[in-house]
Amino acid sequence: MRAPYQTLTILYKKENEQIKFAIFYRNSHPIWQFVSGGGEDNETPIETVVREIKEETSLIIDKSEIRQLDSRTTIPVLNITGKYTWGDSVFVVPEYTFAVELKNYDIKLSNEHKEYKWVEYREAMEKLRYDSNKTALWELNERLI
């Protein structure tokens, strides 16, 4: 069963003193975003991050590589599942944010995404649609510089 939370994970790499961020173009919606998804059954948010990265990119990440960010938001349930999955009184669920520095860049996209790009901070901010993605990116960038 779908757990009542969402995760957002920023994948980044450092090359020649530059930081680049992986953004993904969804097949189902014409938007750029980071790796995202909801928990399943009794997964912790960290376990969800590991699974979502594997599902969306084919990369295997160890839990120790995941950095939790302070940025959080809530998302309307109807935007996630299309119905009130967790009862009539649950209208929004939390979205927790994370970051992972990649050493292996061999991303193989799932059918959820049409393409991905490695971009610098400014371009990512221009392409991302959701404010929650932009806030998490700003926080991570500030922590890295």
Residue locations for each model-derived region?
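Conserved N-terminal beta-strand and adjoining loop/helix that marks the start
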Residues: 1-21, 41
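Residue-level signal for short segments within beta-strands and strand-turn junctions
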Residues: 11-13, 25, 101-102
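Short, charged/polar surface micro-motifs in flexible loops or helix N-caps
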Residues: 16-17, 28-30, 40-41, 72-77, ...
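Conserved Nudix-box catalytic region and its N-terminal flanking loop in Nudix hydrolases
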Residues: 18-61
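Short aromatic/basic micro-patch
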Residues: 33, 92, 118
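Active-site segment of metal-dependent pyrophosphate-handling enzymes
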Residues: 59-104
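NUDIX/MutT-family hydrolases
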Residues: 95-138
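C-terminal alpha-helix
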Residues: 139-144
